[in-house]
Amino acid sequence: MKYVALKDVCKINMGQSPDSSSYNENGEGIPFFQGNADFGERYPVTRVWCNAPTKIAQSEDILISVRAPIGALNYAKEKCCIGRGLAAITPDKSKVSLEFVYWFLKGKNAELKSKGTGSTFKAI
């Protein structure tokens, strides 16, 4: 078996919070997810939109919580803006499948949580 770094088979896009003046609850712009509080069983639930996104995840990207609680996962069901509490992982499908990466990360949840640092809340 050959082990490779995640960054060698996936693009990792760390979230960034857009200006709060671009947030809205009336559907203008694209869905905005700040962290795993927006996560559903498989896909996030849209409550807030953003009309000036800074970091974007594409449909079928894996969304991972990078702030407490670390490691929660969802799939992006559409193009969306991601805040500082999330990262989007885009597998290079010529190297690895989306499902493999999702379940691999799910299996590494305890290890990811153990890597968290911070006194107020854990983050990776």
Language model segments and positions:
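Residues that recognize and position ribonucleotide moieties
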Residues: P31, C80, K122
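A generic secondary-structure signal marking the coil-to-beta-strand transition
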Residues: K2, E28-P31, I62
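Specificity-determining recognition surfaces
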Residues: L105-I124
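Generic structural signal for secondary-structure transition and capping sites
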Residues: M14-G15, D38, N109-A110
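Short beta-strand/loop turn elements enriched in aromatics
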Residues: P18-N36
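Non-catalytic DNA-recognition/assembly elements of restriction-modification systems
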Residues: M1-S17
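Hydrophobic (often cysteine-bearing) scaffold residues that line and stabilize catalytic clefts
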Residues: K2, S97, F121
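A short beta-sheet element
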Residues: Q34-N36, Y43-K108
